[in-house]
Amino acid sequence: MGGAATMLAVASMVMAAKLRVRLRLLIPAVENSVSGNAFRPMDVVPTRKGITVEIGNTDAEGRLILCDALYEGASEKPAMMIDCATLTGAARVALGTDLPALFCNDDTLADDLIAAGRRVTDPMWRMPLFKGYRRLLDSKVADINNVSAGGFGGAITAALYLKEFVPDDVPWAHFDMMAWNNTSRPGRPEGGEAQAARAIFAAIEKKFG
């Protein structure tokens, strides 16, 4: 929900500023209740791209719907594609609660976002899409597993999972965030926070405004 709220905030700012940009907002939202047809560990499910996914952990459900949204969004070959998600606890372990982890397949887009974050005091930290860890998502019964073997590098492997659904020629940025303030600070009250929203808007405004 935190990632969806962040992207809604970005869309609201873009529309309020009347930027000359075609913006498409995709929010994958599904029921997540336990029922007789709920998915189970070791299930194999298809995706919009046609890739099959082994369910290694049912708690890694967010990436299962986000990957379909990314594949759909990439089908239009956008000038940039950005997603935000409260995807992993591993990103919090690595960077704490105040710094969203940025994963990006395009150095120019990453530099633009980081520079925008500095301008508007909306910090982030770039993390690697280390290709060597892709092997940790291998599955014996499907094209890919939804979690890594062993659990190490969880934020990286989650981002690598999503990368499978984004063509290399589509500039893409993925934010793995907390979207919450545990304590109040000046300008940042305790509670939900649209982390990276101001930075994303500032980058879009500079590029398309």
Which residues make up each language-model segment?
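A generic structural signal for tightly packed, nonpolar segments enriched in small/aliphatic residues
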Residues: 1-209
